[in-house]
Amino acid sequence: MWRLVAVALLALPLGSSIALAEDMKLPPLRKQPTQQAVIDEHMDALNKCDWNRLMAQYPADYQLNLPDGVVVKGREAAAKIFADFVKPHDQGGLCGIKFSPEQTLVVGDTLNIQWNAEADFLAEPYKGSDAYETHDGLMVAMVSTFKGSDLKMKK
């Protein structure tokens, strides 16, 4: 996001995401067999703008820490954030961004990733880092440098 995501989402209007998330039923949790599988599923779901697959990874106590002291707590709050992210770009979302890992470091149950994000609507690639905390086959926390207002869009 990867999970870079949420701050970009902060640059998007949240009103429509709240309505969208309320209309969308949270999918059942789907545990992955390994720490790497959790991250691979997250990245693939994010890159494919698959809200259901994203939400199947986050338990009720999920926490996302973003720049500027923004903290998203809980599965329902994350659902609202990601609902905007997966919308097509022409509808105010960021669907179309592809996150590619450039460097990975595992420390215990935390996977630290430096990534590159590119999209047809971006004027230049965007780089960032995320730390993913996994437990029992789920993503329980993420710390991300992703900040949507820093994306340079094509005019």
What are these regions (language model features)?
Residues 58, 115-119, 145-146:
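Short beta-strand segments enriched in hydrophobic/aromatic residues
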Residues 79-123:
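Surface-exposed, charged secondary-structure patches
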Residues 19-56, 60, 153:
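Short, low-complexity N-terminal intrinsically disordered segments enriched in polar/charged residues
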Residues 6-16:
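Bacterial N-terminal signal peptides
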Residues 62-73, 88-92:
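A short gly/proline-enriched turn/hairpin at secondary-structure junctions
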Residues 42, 54-55, 62, 74, ...:
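Hydrophobic pocket/interface hotspot
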Residues 51, 64, 99-106, 144:
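Hydrophobic/anchoring residues in structured secondary elements
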Residues 2, 125-155:
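Short beta-strand edge/turn micro-motifs at domain boundaries
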